[in-house]
Amino acid sequence: MAVPKQKKSKSKSRFKKKNFLLKNKIIAKNQYNNYFIKHRCLV
């Protein structure tokens, strides 16, 4: 019973990590877009 439990937690953590990376990518993209828009407004 302990082995499937370990597997489950492992896949869950992997999914969390994937989600976290995806979120970071989106945030980075938004920050870049915001900077680009501000820069364009200044120029």
From Swiss-Prot:
Any one annotated GO CC term: large ribosomal subunit
Name by which UniProt lists this protein: Large ribosomal subunit protein bL32
Alphabetized UniProt keyword annotations: Ribonucleoprotein, Ribosomal protein
GO molecular function: structural constituent of ribosome
Coiled coil stretches, renumbered: none
Keyword set includes Iron-sulfur: no
Domain of life: Bacteria
Keyword Ribonucleoprotein: yes
Assigned protein family: Belongs to the bacterial ribosomal protein bL32 family.
One GO term (biological process): translation
InterPro entries named among the record's database cross-references: Ribosomal_bL32
Species the sequence originates in: Carsonella ruddii (strain PV)
